[in-house]
Amino acid sequence: MKQFAHSFALAWALALSPFVAHAQVAVQANPDHEQMLASGDPRAAANKRLVYDFWREVFEGGHMELADKYMAESYIQHNPNVATGRAAFVAFFSRIAKSVPIEARVKAPLVAVVAEGDRVILCFVRTAKDPKEPTATYTTTWFDMFRIEDAKIAEHWDGAARS
């Protein structure tokens, strides 16, 4: 009887688990940017800082005149909406970005900055409209990955779809 009760309880738990397993934990930004930029590997720390400062100054700040400080001329772009090459990046973003004062920190809600070898990944909180509930939103993540070569951003990937 005891084994039956245990089996019955386990069956109930398994039957209810699909409802519990789909409850999302909201994605949270990490407020400690300096901790995310730190690394025991000097090369990883330098690569993280390069990408972080590029994001702050060029991407968020709209200062396209600083692109050559951060990006290789032969920059390879894997986002389907932006052509390859530093000049193409600058031309594209010059049309849509306005120069604003450069902030001391990345404004977008960062979850993590990860470096491995010549790659750096920025992970962000992304808030999206819930397709099942038009008045609701949910959080998810967005990733941008960069390859560094000769202390410049040489290549970029993200999850963008063609628009």
Give the label of every model feature segment.
Residues 7-18:
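Bacterial N-terminal signal peptides
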Residues 6-7, 159:
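Short amphipathic alpha-helical "recognition" segments used for binding
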Residues 22-163:
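C-terminal and inter-domain tail/linker signature
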Residues 1-4:
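Positively charged n-region of N-terminal signal peptides that target proteins for export
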